[in-house]
From Swiss-Prot:
Cofactor(s) named in the record: a divalent metal cation
Subunit structure, interactors included: Homodimer.
Binding site for ATP: T13, F14, H18, P19, G20, H21, D96
Catalytic activity: FMN + ATP + H(+) = FAD + diphosphate
Disulfide pattern: none
Family: Belongs to the archaeal FAD synthase family.
One Gene Ontology MF term: FMN adenylyltransferase activity
Keywords: ATP-binding, FAD, Flavoprotein, FMN, Nucleotide-binding, Nucleotidyltransferase, Transferase
Name of the protein described by the UniProt record: FAD synthase
Extent of the signal sequence: none
Taxonomic lineage: Archaea, Methanobacteriati, Methanobacteriota, Stenosarchaea group, Methanomicrobia
Species: Methanothrix thermoacetophila (strain DSM 6194 / JCM 14653 / NBRC 101360 / PT)
GO process annotations (BP): FAD biosynthetic process; FMN metabolic process
Amino acid sequence: MRGTMTRVMATGTFDILHPGHLLYLERSRALGDELVVVVARDINVKHKPRPVVPEDQRLRMVSALKMVDMAVLGSVTDIFEPVRALRPDIITLGYDQYMDENWLEGELRKRGLMARVVRISEREPCELCSSRQIVEKILKERC
């Protein structure tokens, strides 16, 4: 920790921003004094379809959000690189992110990184609160 400042790191793809992303980032920001967001690189998104919006545009959109103090692109080769560089006190995961909290904490410790991992389990209750739902609706109604 930097003095009394708590740095929180949120991670994600953030393809087609929606209220679910905002809730995740608001809840993450509430855990500390500073919110740093790591936006996934296009090439690294393998657990779901590749993003529709290119990484540079997703980074720009996330950077513009008022609850975000800083946003960076993730590393192409090492997911722990931004963690080493930015030294967060807390790393948050969204309710639907595939990574296991215990596994992540173990991997952090192996690398001498002491960040606590917190799952933001709250979900935004709306019809179009996932990028997948938005894409499906566009395909159904506009194509």
